[in-house]
Amino acid sequence: MIDVNKFESMQIGLASPNKIRSWSYGEVKKPETINYRTLKPEKDGLFDERIFGPTKDWSCACGKYKGIRYRGIVCDRCGVEVTSAKVRRERMGHIELAAPVSHIWYFKGIPSRMGLVLDISPRALEEVIYFAAYIVIDAGDTDLEDKQLLTEAEYREKKAKFGDRFEAKMGAEAVKELLEQVDIDKEVHELKEELKTATGQKRTRAIRRLDILDAFKNSGNKPSWMVMDCIPVIPPDLRPMVQLDGGRFATSDLNDLYRRVINRNNRLKRLLDLNAPRIIVQNEKRMLQEAVDALIDNGRRGRPVVGPGNRPLKSLSHMLKGKQGRLRQNLLGKRVDYSGRSVIDVSPELKFYQCGVPRPMALELFKPFVMHELVKRGLASNIKNAKRKIDREDDDIWDILEDVIKERPVLLNRAPTLHRLGIQAFEPVLVPGKSIRLHPLACEAYNADFDGDQMAIHVPLSDEAVAESRLLMLAAHHILAPKDGKPIVTPSQDIVLGNYWLTQAERGREGEGMIFDSPAEAAIAYANGDIHYHTRIGLAADSMPEKPWPKGYEHGIFVTTYGKLVFNQIFPKDFYYINDPTQENLTHPVDERYFLQPGEDIHEKLDNMKLGQAFKKGFLSDSIAQIYKDYKVQRTSDFLDDLKELGYTVCTTSGLTIGVEDIPTISDKDDIVAEARKKVDVVSKQYRRGLITDEERHDRVISIWNNCKDIVQNEIAQIIHAPRNPITIMADSGARGNISNFTQLAGMRGLMAAPNGGMMEIPVTSNFREGLSVLEMFMSTHGARKGMTDTALKTANSGYLTRRLVDVAQDVIIREEDCGTDRGLTVHAITEGDEMIEPLFDRLVGRYTSKSVYDPETHEVICPADVLMDEDMAHKIVDAGVTEVTIRSVFTCNTQHGVCKKCYGMNLATGDDVEVGEAVGTVAAQSIGEPGTQLTMRNFHNGGVAGAADITQGLPRVQELFEARNPKGRATISEVTGEVTSIEEDPAEHTRQITVKGQTDTRTYDVPYTASVAVAEGDHVVRGDKLTLGSIDPKELIRVRDALTTEKYILSEIQKAYRMQGVEIADKHVEVMARQMLQKVRILDPGETDILPGELMDIGEFKARNREVIISGGIPATAQSVILGITKAALETNSFLSAASFQETTRVLTDASIRGKNDPLLGLKENVIIGKIIPAGTGMPVYREMEPKVDVPEDEKKKSVYSIADIEKKLAAADAEKDNGSAD
């Protein structure tokens, strides 16, 4: 067996006839498959055992030799080799064709490869191959020309005139002869000479021919191999034939296609033996050609061959293509054993790293382990008995199952898996019932809820898989989201509600102003009913000596509520006491204003103090981030469980309920609506008098009703902050609902969307508390349906975008420590007008500085070069008033086929330096694709405001940028640097003319009247600046400026599209994508290299080729940067396996085989396809070739790995400590 993991690379090429015969184990001569009575394969047929191997293991066809002891013997009676039946999946046969046949891929593809080699048009070629015309092969001394086409009549005439002085043939034989005559070296030399002078169409054609001929020359493929003398027959088990219940047979379409070829081939052989008339033979040859075409690619030419029920048959090409093809269905996505799926359910009592697995499911998944253990413990005599015991569900198997699943994590996955957190590892816990139990905090990452969602469960089997699951994939490690480094495990709903209610303060609650010596004392008072969670009390600071307090107040008394005191007890002992929901309080001790001054009366202080704020959802998230930063994974995981526990408990005991009476009402809604109606009447009157157009009337009506709704909303916003209303508590805490929901409940629903995407002019003035009228209800249904359809479309679009992104960046891996580049990217805050899109702080965190950062006032170094900026450093830089910083960036990284650690910076999912081997391309694609569903589908309009151009936003804008398409609402940009000398109107042409005068030349741009001009006379513009408002076309920008400017533009535009929707994505992910789009250059002048003009080439390869030429003293090639959309970039990759499995499979493979392409197996996909371990993470050669260290001291070993059992011990110790603490 070949060991795939030793492969360096994989090459594809054209198969010569001899190669095909060497693969074959015998010729298939008859179209028979299996005998319908005996069900045995027919001799010389498509399933012949002599050719393809025995159907039963270690047994010949006639039964003379049975058993493994005869392996390798060929039976003398039936001629079948005794071997394993598995060989029927790998042994090929062949069919010797009676006439040569052209391969449809090379004749029909665009451009036609045969046509280019022979310099014949594809139309002419088709006529020859399908016997409609003769082609002159050798003109001899006649007035005919080589490769001239002759009709049947012309051929006869010339034959009569010249006799045998010329030769002309038809069919694939003629093409084959012509291909054999091609002198590649001569043709290449001639074409190179021609290129020196040729221009226009001639030049393009010459370049394309030269490209193909060069490919044949360099790859060692012969052009004549594009015409086949024999065709391979694929192994029978790959085109099976099985008997169904009713005695009928189900067979693969390929068998039908092969049978047609064999039938026609045999008929042709017979006709040739009989010396049949030429016209009959030609017809049979044409039919054979069509049969082979159908076998290779049915439907590519003419009407497809159909089977029963007029269904086109699936040919060899269809077996590879598309989602159901070999590449995507079987090689990139396999079904796996040891897996199950079930409905999910919530289980709040689980720890963060646990999940509940139903007993019967766990038993089935861990069956082999349980069987092994039963035999080991002597509870079953052998494996068979152990299996029987499990099937009977004996009582003694359950204890063993408990033991077996300890220390064996399982993987849980929820589809759609939009980012890497869609698969996480958990420690299984056996639960009754049939549903998988999930921890409530793990829902956010999976985007799961419990309304019937299902999840799949997988068991990692090998020791390496178990170790990786535990150390890399355990849910407790996945606290930060890779897209922005913010916590993804955010408490929601009840947990938020409980903690918010717990930390509220009230005036005049029982026991207000009591002062306690210690938390334990306060707990007793609460148990006795003397105080409430909301009671404001005094507490001695020295009862918590580990906590940092303000200087001089270490022994003071401070004001807090009992609820906040309880909340603080889940934090680490030495963490600050949290009294205010502010970032300040998470990083500094309690504010001094909460402390009693000597001699101050607590009641008086409480009367004069504002009530403290309760802790909302956002603050809980901030505190998780802070604890993760200070205490790392282990402690954060415990904190999350305590937070969950506290939230649920308090929420339950608080007794919060909601009823219809809790929805507030506003008294003057009717007046506001009446006022709006009056304004609408005025507008209608103006329209009837012809003062305004219908469009203006519509826009004004819409804006009147929108204003009306805003007024109502503002009134509600004021009522809503009633501190004791359960509905407002729910909204204010961030548990559920927002102001817009309340406007609809208590105010008015407002305008509804019309099916055509606009707005209906008639508003819904009622709210849900009053109830809607029938008409209003009907109007609402349009919008509701549109919402549903939009969501469905958006999901599909967003999923496809993710797939293209993953494909273009799948080979971007962290390859080295430092690429040593001296270039960097200067970043500043991204703004749109006065609106801040992305602040500088967000762009600095987690990046390396490229140059030192100086304080703009004192000129001291704040941050030296080559330092990874964390949040503290970034705050320091921003607070000093620095507006731009030069950082290391993926754009300027010099690493080939990937990025280096320094240019990438921090791994946002861990908050540490990124490691060599991290698959940052895939992470970037997931980070951009996963929030795609949150973007809107529509191209926003500006509510009818005149002047501003309609620009695309949301998902269409993101696609437009990544595909480098011409944007809608394209801006005109300046090609020169200089000043705007004049802006003139040309009424006749309906255009404006903007003139820009540069240093050397002056340019005038015609822009339509409708475009808004972005410059004024006298303005200074730099080339690449916008002259009109709109979106810049990146292809134009790269032509006028350079690749870096274009990359920066794409980055800021993508950020705008996402941040407008409130989605945060780190710059580095977009940088990885943009860099992949600009990896190629187009050759302008090849100099003295052997590159072709107009060729697309990888920047790295281009530099390497030029380096060689310069060293040998030649003239280097020149090229210009080009931008490719992600689809094009993914297809232009160096790996033909990756490209073929992405899109246009046949085109990619045709091209790759002619060029004899070599796939270096650098990316992830190509390695998955051939089954090699992927070159990311521990699969990197760097790590695979490591030797284990010898003589590691025992205590060192213990330090490096901790198991779940260790965690359990720590937890138990912590619990015991807690119990002692409360007992004190």
Curated annotation (Swiss-Prot):
Annotated binding of Mg(2+), by residue: 449, 451, 453
Stored InterPro entries: DNA-dir_RpoC_beta_prime, DNA-dir_RpoC_beta_prime_bact, RNA_pol_asu, RNA_pol_N, RNA_pol_Rpb1_1, RNA_pol_Rpb1_3, RNA_pol_Rpb1_3_sf, RNA_pol_Rpb1_4
GO CC terms: DNA-directed RNA polymerase complex
Tree of life domain: Bacteria
A GO molecular-function descriptor: DNA-directed RNA polymerase activity
Residues the record lists as binding Zn(2+) 1: 60, 62, 75, 78
Comment on bound cofactor: Binds 1 Mg(2+) ion per subunit. Binds 2 Zn(2+) ions per subunit.
Enzyme class, UniProt record, top EC level: transferase
SUPFAM superfamilies: beta and beta-prime subunits of DNA dependent RNA-polymerase
The EC number(s) this enzyme carries: 2.7.7.6
Any GO BP: DNA-templated transcription
Reaction(s) this enzyme catalyzes, per UniProt: RNA(n) + a ribonucleoside 5'-triphosphate = RNA(n+1) + diphosphate
Binding site for Zn(2+) 2: 819, 893, 900, 903
This protein's UniProt keywords: DNA-directed RNA polymerase, Magnesium, Metal-binding, Nucleotidyltransferase, Transcription, Transferase, Zinc
Cofactors: Mg(2+); Zn(2+)
PANTHER family: DNA-DIRECTED RNA POLYMERASE (PTHR19376), DNA-DIRECTED RNA POLYMERASE SUBUNIT BETA (PTHR19376:SF54)
Family note: Belongs to the RNA polymerase beta' chain family.
HAMAP family: RNApol_bact_RpoC
Subunit structure of this chain's protein: The RNAP catalytic core consists of 2 alpha, 1 beta, 1 beta' and 1 omega subunit. When a sigma factor is associated with the core the holoenzyme is formed, which can initiate transcription.
Function: DNA-dependent RNA polymerase catalyzes the transcription of DNA into RNA using the four ribonucleoside triphosphates as substrates.
Protein name according to UniProt: DNA-directed RNA polymerase subunit beta'
Organism from which the protein derives: Lactobacillus johnsonii (strain CNCM I-12250 / La1 / NCC 533)
